[in-house]
Amino acid sequence: MSTARDRVESITPADGSVLGVAVIDVAGFVADLKSQAIDYGFHVHDERHFVETYSLRQLWEVDLHPEEACAGPIDLHLSLDVDPRALLGFEDEVMKMEDLDEEPPRGFTFPLLFTWTLPPLKYPPDLLVLATDIAGVGGLDLPVEVSAIDSFPSVTDAPERSLSIVARIALDLCDVYMNNDASVAQALDRCKHVSLYLLERADAWLDDEDDDDDII
């Protein structure tokens, strides 16, 4: 494992000038994130990377699902928003460090979002009960927000309810720089528990067996 000194010296020539290479390897972090997700029982099936040409803001997205739900109906969407201002500010602080092996200052963060998706629900749960239960499953390591959207396919149709289940953590660049993945590991562990909680109840929310009774 490389040290802080190795990483900084690798981008700092002998004359003291600084090359245009980032201190934080975001692509490497995303690769490690996918590897960790697999270790916690998720299957990764897609990845996207977007860059705004003007602001240089980046968005990394990873689509995965728990290995118990290969046939659906639950998917988990990870998104990492890379703010160039936070990244450049952190790099400036690292370059000011006299002892390159010490821990850099904290406070520079990227938001890492976890979003669960399910099909529209025929028998949606009570939102207050669901939010309370999921809050207990996610715990303090993964605060989860629950909301819902009702849509009408046509004016004569009954509403279809879709759940919005989102968790957000602040990814401190100090932890990324020091290869400290404890917070990410805790979040992925909680994500697996939330995914299994939803999977156990999804069939009842989606069940359409009663439709046969309405057919004449």
Each language-model region and where it sits:
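Short, charged/polar micro-motifs that form catalytic or ligand-binding hotspots
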Residues: G16-V23, A27, P120, Y177, ...
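Glycine-rich, aromatic-bearing surface loops/beta-hairpins
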Residues: T109, K122-I216
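A general secondary-structure signal for short beta-strands and their flanking turns/coil
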Residues: R57-L59, A71-D75, P105-P111, E160-V166
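A short, surface-exposed helix-loop junction/capping segment
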Residues: S2-G20
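Eukaryotic endomembrane contact-site and trafficking scaffolds
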Residues: S17-L19, A31-S35, T132-G136, R190
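N-terminal interaction modules that seed assembly of large macromolecular complexes
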Residues: S17-V21, L33-L100
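Short beta-strand-to-loop capping motifs
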Residues: A22, L64-P66, W116-L118, I169-V176
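C-terminal basic regulatory modules in eukaryotic proteins
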Residues: P73-E145
